[in-house]
Regions:
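A short, conserved, highly charged catalytic patch centered on acidic carboxylates
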Residues: 1-104, 112-140
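N-terminal amphipathic/basic helix or basic patch
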Residues: 5-13, 159-166, 170, 184, ...
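An acidic intrinsically disordered interaction segment
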Residues: 53-63, 144-167
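Short amphipathic alpha-helical segments and their helix-coil junctions
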Residues: 71-76, 161-180
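Core catalytic lobe of class I
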Residues: 171-175, 183-202
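Long recognition/docking surfaces used for binding and targeting
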Residues: 194, 200-263
Length: 263
């Protein structure tokens, strides 16, 4: 008789090697956001439902891994992927569809009772997307490989690009209301995007109590990032001069809401 516990043990043993980087929850979650999203995710309809494993990254809370297990390899995936309670792919995709309303989700379907017979399928369901996309191969990977593959995937690139377009459009409209010249708006948006690539700035910008101090920090960070990109000498000096208006334009450095709320 097929024993799903064997499948779970194999899966648990693999991911338990990475507990320095991840947290593993089994058939429940202490995260209120996750719990709320799964409140009607029962595979049989009605009520809460939970996958065998929910894995979250300690350094990247935007991504969840959900894993659904079946002992019988013939119960790996149904033709229409709508037999949620009976097939591992179907169930994993169901949970991913619910959790993708608040997270990017890597859904992993596992079937088989031995390492030799194990079947593994991976799907990436990005937040607010309508469907999941196959990704990776048919073997377990390390959690670092999962994270790096997700971050570098074409799907994630497209999501980030679209988010960036929305951000720059909204920011441009906001700056227009402060009567910032179009040429200066472009420079300011560029400076913000450059500065946000700097981890230290990204973590600390909200701590500035005065917009004047934030403006100084922004310009210094941009200069540091440009220098790190091997832009030096006269070229760096010219770029710093172009960005310097951020410190001197009173509509930016004096109006509290303008610069502070642009990130």
């Amino acid at each position: 008789m097929a024993n799903e516990r064997k499948t779970e043990i194999i899966t648990r043993d693999h991911f338990s090697k990475f507990l320095d980087s991840i947290d593993i929850e089994e058939q429940r979650s202490d995260n209120p956001k996750i719990d709320k999203l799964l409140k009607s995710a029962s595979k049989k309809g009605g009520g809460k439902g939970y996958p065998e494993f929910i894995i979250s990254y300690k350094t990247n809370p935007d991504l969840l891994i959900v894993i659904e297990c079946k002992a019988d390899v013939t119960k790996h995936e149904s033709k229409d992927r709508d037999k949620y309670a009976d097939f591992s792919v179907d169930g994993a995709l169901l949970y991913a569809s619910y959790l993708s309303k608040g997270f990017d989700v890597l859904a992993i379907a596992v079937s088989g009772e031995t390492k030799q017979s194990l079947r593994v399928s991976h799907f990436l369901h990005l937040r607010d997307e309508k469907k999941a996309t196959p990704i990776f191969g048919d073997k377990f990977l390390s959690v670092d490989d999962y994270l790096n593959g997700y971050l570098k995937s074409p799907e994630k690139f497209r999501q980030d690009y679209n988010s960036l377009l929305d951000f720059t459009k909204q920011l441009n409209e906001k700056l227009h209301t402060y009567k910032i010249l179009e040429s200066q708006r472009s420079l300011l948006i560029s400076s913000i995007l450059i500065a946000l690539e700097n981890t230290a700035f990204k973590r600390s910008y909200a701590s500035h109590k005065k917009p004047e101090n934030l403006a100084v920090s922004l310009i210094q960070t941009v200069s540091d990032e440009l220098e790190s990109a091997n832009i030096t000498g006269k070229k760096l000096e010219n770029l710093n001069t172009q960005f310097s208006f951020i410190k001197t334009d009173t509509s930016l450095s004096k109006k509290r809401k303008c610069l502070e709320r642009n990130y």
